[in-house]
């Protein structure tokens, strides 16, 4: 869309934003929302507070205070967005996307900032990270939730958290746990996904995969080549036993002595007859700007090694390689 088309949508945008009026306690605070959202949708080269405010003819400090000091009900706004998506865009073939965003930040005052992996620049950098849940169906897509990842170093320093305005109830949670909470909130508001998809940052976490399976959610996950699994479920002993005939009986399940060790996906591809002897199947994924993207794939069933080291859920494994860019 060009700038004229966006400006032509102003009446529609105004009506849409009116649906969030009850999320603000004060009318003067509420009035800044159209200014900020309109600036984000504009063709301004920079979309921070100052250029947005100057373009709208308001004082930059006013818009800065709107974002940093004024109060609104964030939870109600999030729930309202999800309810509108359910009402207007629910349908078949809906996909949920779990992903994270990292923003490079200088200094050490911004909540959650520290030197950590920054996907935006592809290396460790001083940045903050947020975990997001997106929704897509047909030609519609939007973000429906997100939350800040608070590193352990921050969580353990409550004085630093208070100085940054982080409430006491906000503590360190692994990113996969944040993702499950986003998913549960969306489901609680009636939003459903035919499939959920995410990269290996989440696909490598057995507790996350198990959590989705426990909730009955289908998913397509990227997993690393080190992902640990079996080609078929190994035998497990459930009866109590004593190690060496001494001590207290152990009652938790364990792998039987004759159980095979789990294998990485990389080793499974090399050594498992189910994959090793299977021919590659070629697919044209898409025609890109640099030419066609062609993948070759193999498929088999595997049993995931869970967080306790025991056989977990059964999964379909699709191994893919890029033929033209190996």
Residue map of PLM features:
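Basic, low-complexity segments
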Residues: 1-25
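An anionic, glycine-rich sequence signature occurring as long contiguous blocks
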Residues: 14, 138-164, 168, 224, ...
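Electropositive nucleic-acid engagement tracts
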Residues: 28-30, 35, 39-108, 244-284
């Amino acid at each position: 869309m060009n700038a004229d088309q966006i400006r032509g949508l102003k009446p529609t945008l105004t009506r849409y934003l009116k649906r969030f009026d009850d999320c603000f306690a004060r009318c003067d605070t509420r009035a800044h929302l159209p200014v900020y959202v309109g600036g984000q949708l504009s063709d301004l080269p920079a979309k921070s507070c100052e250029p947005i405010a100057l373009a709208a003819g308001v004082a930059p400090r006013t818009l800065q205070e709107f974002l940093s000091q004024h109060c609104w009900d964030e939870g109600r706004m999030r729930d309202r967005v999800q309810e509108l998506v359910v009402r207007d865009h629910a349908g078949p073939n809906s996909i949920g996307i779990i992903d994270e965003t990292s923003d490079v930040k200088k200094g050490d005052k911004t909540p959650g900032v520290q030197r950590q992996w920054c996907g935006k620049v592809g290396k460790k950098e001083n940045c903050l990270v947020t975990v997001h849940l997106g929704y897509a169906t047909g030609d519609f897509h939007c973000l429906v939730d997100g939350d800040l990842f608070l590193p352990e170093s921050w969580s353990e320093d409550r004085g630093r958290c208070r100085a940054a305005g982080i409430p006491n109830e906000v503590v360190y949670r692994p990113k996969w746990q944040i993702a499950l909470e986003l998913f549960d909130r969306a489901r609680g508001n009636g939003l459903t996904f035919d499939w959920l998809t995410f990269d290996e940052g989440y696909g490598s976490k057995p507790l996350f995969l198990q959590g989705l399976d426990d909730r009955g959610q289908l998913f397509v996950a990227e997993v690393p080549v080190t992902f640990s699994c079996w080609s078929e479920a190994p035998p497990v002993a459930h009866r109590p036993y004593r190690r060496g005939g001494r001590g207290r009986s152990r009652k938790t399940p364990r792998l039987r002595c004759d159980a095979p060790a789990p294998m990485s996906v990389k080793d499974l591809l090399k050594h498992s007859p189910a994959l090793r002897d299977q021919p590659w199947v070629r697919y044209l994924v898409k025609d890109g700007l640099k030419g066609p993207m062609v993948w070759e794939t193999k498929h088999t069933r595997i049993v995931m090694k869970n967080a306790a080291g025991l056989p977990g859920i059964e999964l379909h494994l699709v191994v893919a390689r890029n033929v033209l860019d190996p």
